[in-house]
C-alpha cells in the first residue's frame, strides 16, 4: 500500500515521487471481513478499536483532507528491503541485456515488457481519447510483435522511441523534463528501464488526478460510510456512546465553570478571557457547537490511552496523538525562541534567515525531548547561545558577555522543568489559537496571534489546519449523535442553538 502524504498536489495528473523500475499494482486496503457472526454481549475498548478498524482508513483520510494525495513509498537505499529490491531489479535488467545481446537475440522478456507498457499507456487514457487508444493498440499489436520476434526482426529501440512520443503526449507538465532526458538514451535496456520509472510516476499522477476529481463525492461517501458502520456497531451495543457522553458532559461543565473566549479579529487586545467575576456575573449562553469545540480541545490535554476515550473518535486517536506531540514540540520551540529573542532583540530576530536557522537547529535537537528532556534542552541551550554569539560577532556587534550567556543557557534549560512559566504561557496561547481556529477559521486566527507565537506562524498554521480538518470531518460524521447527546446536557434556557453546527 503506498504511503500517504498530505500536501497540495498539482493539477492533472498530480505530482508524486518516483517508484521502482517495474511498476507494481496497488490499490485501496480491503475491508476486513473476519470475525464471528454473533456479536459479543460486551465489547471492550480494545475490541471496539479492532471492530472500528473495519471502516476504510483510506476513505477516512480522503474525506478528512481535501488536499489528500498518494505517493509510492521510496525505500532508503541503505535499508535491507531497499538493497534486496535494487539487487533483484539489477538482475532482471542484466538478464534482459543478455537476451538482447545473444545471437540470435531472445525477445521473450522484451515482449513481456512491451505488453506491460501497452497496458500502462492504455490505463492513462481518458474515456474520450479513442483515437489514441486505437493508435496504441495498432502500434503495439502483441500478435504482430510476436511474429516479428520469431523472425528476429523486433525493433526494440524503435518501439521504445514510439512509447516515448506517446508518453510526451500523455504526461503532466511536471514529467516533461524526465521524458525529454530519456530521448537522449540510445541503449535499449537503459531506455526501457527509464521508461518504466517515468511510467510508474505517471500512473500515480493519474491516481491522484482521479482522487482530486472525485473529491466531493469521496468526501460525502466517506461521511455516509463511516456513519453507517458506526450505526451497525451501535445497534449491536446500545451503550456504545457512554464514553462520548461523559466526554461532552465534562466539556459542558468546563464551559459552565469558565466560559471560553476567543479574540475577535477587530480587537487585537482581547487576548485574555474575562475575569472570574465577569464570568460569574455574565455567563455566556451554552451552544452545542461551543461544547463540542471545548471537547475537542480537551482531547489535546488527555491521556490518549485513557480507557474512557470517546467512541466516536477512536478512528482519530492516532492523529490526535500526532497533533498532541506536534503541539508540545511547538510549545518548547516557541519558548526557546522567546527566551533567546529577549537576549538579542530585533537585531537578530528581525532576520527571517536567522530565525529559520534557529528553528531548524532547535527542531532537530528536540526529537529526543520526550524521552530525555534535560539532555535535549542542554544541547539546545548550548547550540542556541553559540549561534547568537557567533551571529552577533559576524555582524560586528558586541557579543554576549559571559554572564549573559550563562543566564541565557540557564533560562533555556529551565524550559525542560514542569510548570515552567514561559512554557505554561506559550501552551495556553497555542490552545487559545486552536480554539480560535475552530471558531473563526485558521486564516482569521493568524491575523491576531497572541504574543510569543509570531515566530512559529507557519508551523501554527499547519497545526491549526490539521486540527480543523480532523474536527470538521468527525463532526460531519457523528454530528447527529452529538446533537442528541447535547440535548440532554443543555437546557433550553441555556442553549443558543439546538443543533450542532459544522466547526
Curated annotation (Swiss-Prot):
Residues 263-285 have a biased composition (Low complexity). It is a single-pass membrane protein. Residues 1-42, 254-285 are annotated as: Disordered. Residues 1-22 have a biased composition (Basic and acidic residues). Keywords: Cell projection, Cilium, Cytoplasmic vesicle, Developmental protein, Differentiation, Flagellum, Membrane, Spermatogenesis, Transmembrane, Transmembrane helix. One of its GO terms (cellular component) is membrane. Constitutively phosphorylated on serine, threonine and tyrosine residues within the head and tail regions of noncapacitated spermatozoa. Phosphorylation on tyrosine residues increases upon sperm capacitation within the acrosomal region in a protein kinase A (PKA)-dependent signaling pathway. Pfam families: Tcp11. Its main location: membrane. GO terms for biological process: adenylate cyclase-activating G protein-coupled receptor signaling pathway; germ cell development; protein kinase A signaling; regulation of sperm capacitation; spermatogenesis. Disulfide bonds: none annotated. Belongs to the TCP11 family. This is T-complex protein 11 homolog.
